[in-house]
């Protein structure tokens, strides 16, 4: 089977960059780099194993089929995505304490 194409939403890109900036300001470059590597690892994993992330149970029918995976080393941060045979679409990369259904 062909590996699906990766698509990052504008919101996911903004989430990742916002968190990099936050870590740079709070803890410096080493933690920001660790975050970038962890997000890259999580994205690579869902592209390779898209069915591995559990389905989310949101009330909204528009969010059916959304899956999640934790960011390694940052377990409170979650990557939300959908997939089909052709692509893995990353919706958001956010802290799990936020109003997730509203954000997605």
Question: What is each residue range found by the language model?
Answer:
Residues 2-3, 7, 61, 99-104:
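Short, charged, intrinsically disordered terminal tails
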Residues 1-42:
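Arg/Lys-rich, positively charged N-terminal/basic patches that mediate binding to nucleic acids
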Residues 44-72:
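A short, surface-exposed loop/turn module that caps and links secondary-structure elements
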